[in-house]
């Protein structure tokens, strides 16, 4: 039987700091090997003199955390390498995006997210049931 890995990540904290709240789902059919893509990505980083560090957009854009001391050019090159890797990898993704100012409360936002996530899962039900 095939196996599907689903990775879920969110971006945009609660409260007033971020304008948007994003919920991303990355789906990877484990029968589709990504090892060569990872090796190629790591080689590309090494050739360009870039560190192989986890990609986190907010710190990358602001030169915080693991990106401190990196120039804007280095951070742009890192993002370009990762983008190329992501485009070539055999996985798919879905992103739910919400403008936080459109909701009266965090509870309203979460209710909308829950409904949207249920609809998304039902839209993908046939595909998901194949695993």
Predicted regions and their residues:
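Phosphate-ester processing/binding pockets and catalytic centers
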Residues: 1-131
């Amino acid at each position: 039987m095939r196996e599907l890995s689903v990775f879920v990540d969110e971006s945009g904290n609660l409260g007033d700091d971020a304008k948007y709240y994003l919920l991303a789902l990355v789906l990877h059919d484990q029968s589709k090997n990504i090892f060569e893509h990872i090796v190629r990505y790591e080689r590309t980083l090494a050739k360009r003199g870039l560190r192989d560090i986890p990609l986190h957009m907010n710190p990358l854009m602001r030169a915080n955390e693991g990106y401190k001391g990196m120039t804007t050019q280095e951070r742009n090159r890192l993002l370009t390498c990762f983008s190329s890797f992501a485009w070539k990898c055999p996985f798919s993704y879905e992103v739910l995006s919400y403008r936080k100012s459109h909701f009266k409360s965090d509870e309203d936002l979460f209710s909308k997210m829950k409904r949207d996530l249920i609809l998304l899962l039902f839209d993908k039900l046939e595909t998901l049931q194949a695993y």
